[in-house]
A protein has these predicted regions:
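Conserved beta-strand segments of alpha/beta enzyme cores
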Residues: 41, 157-158, 203
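Short helix-loop capping/hinge motifs at secondary-structure junctions, enriched
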Residues: 110-121, 231-232
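N-terminal subdomain of lithium-sensitive/metallo-dependent phosphomonoesterases centered on the IMPase/IPPase/PAP
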Residues: 1-65, 149-152, 169
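Oxyanion/phosphate-interacting regions
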Residues: 148-153, 168-232
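Conserved beta-strand termini and adjacent loop/short-helix elements that scaffold enzyme active sites
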Residues: 45, 161-162, 207
Length: 232
């Protein structure tokens, strides 16, 4: 693999890293999606500078490697992501975490799955749910006051730092019950995970409980609250 030999990296204009691994995965995914859905545009983190989404309602959102830092440094929490947006809403998603040997996908309400030992296992937010110990994933070990307010409101007892879109997956399964984030992520960071969590029965909104729609200017997301089916 490129992680073991021939990996190169550079810093993008937004001060985030990109590797030749990102670009190779991007090329593979884009080629396959063009074969599957030739009429649907593809918007990728690595090619977004060249894309215009004005008035675009149907498109793919791809993040070839979410968690490039982990990928470059031989850590495990990076993911490969593709989400299909129709009428500005997520209708299908695929997330693969190769180093953790985990894959998740969804294609409609009630159809969210994890591929485990060659089997398609339905996920519905109930895997480790304990109503007495509400557990959230977090972007940082240090919780900001505005996020702590939401934690208190939701009676969150524990939080664990986690990177990449894997956060959406572990909330969808019920390994964790939710996630709260300030405006930081771009649309390609969350589209696949949003679909998977939504189709597992969970919910993704902003801090004001508004639905998250796609095709926004500059691909920027607002604040986010993720809830598993058991908290909805």
């Amino acid at each position: 693999s490129l992680r073991n030999k021939g990996l190169t990296k550079k810093i993008k204009s937004d001060n985030t890293p990109v590797s030749n691994g990102d670009l190779e995965v991007d090329k593979i995914i884009s080629t396959k999606l063009k074969e599957l859905t030739p009429s649907i545009p593809i918007i990728s983190e690595e090619t977004s500078d060249n894309k215009s989404i004005e008035d675009l309602k149907d498109f793919w959102l791809v993040d070839p490697i979410d968690g490039t830092y982990d990928y470059i440094n031989n850590l495990e929490e990076f993911t490969i992501n593709a989400g299909l947006i129709l009428d500005r809403k997520p209708v299908a998603g695929l997330i693969c975490a190769p180093a953790k040997k985990r894959m998740f996908y969804s294609y409609g309400e009630g159809n969210a799955y994890e591929f485990i030992n060659g089997n398609e296992v339905k996920i519905d937010g109930s895997r480790n749910f304990n109503k007495d110990i509400i557990k959230f994933v977090s972007y940082s070990n240090k919780i900001k006051p505005e996020i702590q307010i939401i934690f208190d409101k939701l009676n969150v007892k524990e939080h664990t730092k986690m990177k990449s879109s894997l956060k959406f997956c572990v909330v969808a399964t019920g390994e964790f019950d939710g996630y709260v984030a300030e405006p930081r992520a771009c649309e390609w960071d969350i589209a696949a995970g949003h679909a998977i969590l939504k189709h597992s029965g969970g919910l993704v909104t902003d801090f004001d409980n508004n639905e998250i729609l796609y095709g926004k200017k500059d691909f920027k997301n607002p604040s986010l609250i993720l809830k598993s089916k058991m908290l909805v």
